[in-house]
Amino acid sequence: MKKRIAYISLYFFTVLLIFILQKPLFMLYNGSIEKGFGFADYMQVMIHGASLDAATAGYLTAFPFLLVLISIWFRKFPLKKILYGYYILAAALISIIFVVDMALYTFWGFKLDASVFLYIDSPKEALASVSVGFILLRVLAILLLIALNSWVLLKITPSVLTATRKRIAGTAGMLLLGGVLFIIIRGGVTESTSNIGQVYFSNEPFLNHSAVNPDFSLLSSMGKSQDFASEFNFFDEEKRAALFDGLYPTTDGDSIIQVLNTKRPNILIILMEGFGGAFVEPLGGLPDVTPHFNRLSKEGIFFTNCYANSFRTDRGTVCTFSGYLGLPTASVMKIPAKSRTLPAIAEGLSKAGYKTDFLYGGDINFTNMKSYLLSTGYQRLIANTDFSLAEQTSNAWGV
């Protein structure tokens, strides 16, 4: 039994180490020294990226784990022979994705995702901007990495697993180990699951991108590849233009109304969920539920015809801070390659010299929120982990 647990543990940590070692290579290839990043930055990238590396290593450990679990009920189980093909496939995927991601980042500026498949139909055009030597060197690197990774994985794998006398107890023990593996893959036991945003830690996009596991980035984006342009196209362009005409301020003359008594105010944005008009008396809602808000409605600008943009936190947040309408079947916040390109209030304020903080009482890794906030101008994030344990557990959804 110890031999089985030792093998699964060794396999998992070997794959994890492969992913961790990829990070400094990725950074060096993409000019980290020229960009002024030092040893501390390399360490930060590897430490913060380890959780997503562990989740991806967990996925790749799932199949060997199932074989080891089954082997308990066999007198002799030829583990290495069965896993030979799987190791070649796993090594090929790890190596190809790493080299392609490393090479394309120089041109794209973002991590490998499902958009790479858009170029498969026209490889000639995709390869037109690089030389034959460029391609051959990277193909050679892929082949060497496949051979090296396969050799390492085969080296740590026992050839045969023999039967254990206590099969029931052994099965129970392995199932417990499987539970640990599931938690690693999921990314913990909190509301958020493993996502790209959990490894973001810096205001430097390059460091955040370096921390992202390319295998996870590619696989997670494949389920989000949709042709949104062909969906929900209810109006022709002429009618759409007529409906939108007048919604935006004109560019002629001075259309700005001065409503503040200072040109550089402190700005506090409070975003509340479930705060519907049914609870606000000035909107025809119940009386005395929001007395202080009722008072504020008389002192400032009160919008009486304002509707929530979506029914989920991630979609409504992006709409509020970036002015990007929520999509019916997808969350832009969960697509970092898109969300990082959106305009945002915090980004504009940062450029104007403001310090931008974001306070959130819940798990800020939920639905990739962390990556969106750091990518759109927020300089400091305060979340549930900044509070005491008692405060963190005071409510299921945060402080």
Task: Give the role of each language-model region.
Residues 2-227:
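Transmembrane and membrane-interface helices of multi-pass
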Residues 190-399:
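Soluble catalytic regions of membrane-associated enzymes that act on cell-envelope
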